[in-house]
């Protein structure tokens, strides 16, 4: 059985958080963000779940915990299941702030998340390219590392397991 709250935290911080690494490591992602004229931020606020703000500039992407009051685009989400549906592409997010900047979501943000999907769910053929294989490995490592942290912090069994691990 899937714990939708734990999955939402994993999707927020591990999956969307990997956009930071993608924008730093991948030439195609760098090309996508190179068109950004001034920094733009997108905040996701999940009721009874995670909230974070992603800020994009031509120099990269940064994720901050919580909703920045001065974010350009705010996307409130009713619950963790809806947020997981957004990540799966089954639910369409509706911004309550920044409707004039929706073009960023439809073009740049979508292009970045499509590229992230391409990197994280590669074809066998793509993995034959050593540079792509390296990018996939680095992004996967980052995603898994953060996912483990979220599971340890959010999931009941994960919390129990984490509590039995000696610090250090």
Regions found by a protein language model. Name each.
Residues 1-167:
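Feature captures hydrophobic
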């Amino acid at each position: 059985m899937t714990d939708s709250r734990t999955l939402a935290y994993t999707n927020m911080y591990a999956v969307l958080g990997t956009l930071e690494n993608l924008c730093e490591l991948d030439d195609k992602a760098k090309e996508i963000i190179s068109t950004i004229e001034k920094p733009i931020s997108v905040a996701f606020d999940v009721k009874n779940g995670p909230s974070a703000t992603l800020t994009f500039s031509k120099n990269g992407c940064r994720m901050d915990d919580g909703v920045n009051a001065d974010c350009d685009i705010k996307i409130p989400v009713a619950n963790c299941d809806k947020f997981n549906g957004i990540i799966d592409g089954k639910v369409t997010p509706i911004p309550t702030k920044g409707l004039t900047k929706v073009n960023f979501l439809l073009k740049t943000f979508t292009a970045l998340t499509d590229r992230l999907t391409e990197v994280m769910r590669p074809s066998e053929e793509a993995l034959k390219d050593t540079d792509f294989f390296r990018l996939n490995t680095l992004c996967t490592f980052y995603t898994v590392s953060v996912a483990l942290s979220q599971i340890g912090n959010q999931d009941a069994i994960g919390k129990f397991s984490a509590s039995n691990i000696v610090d250090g």
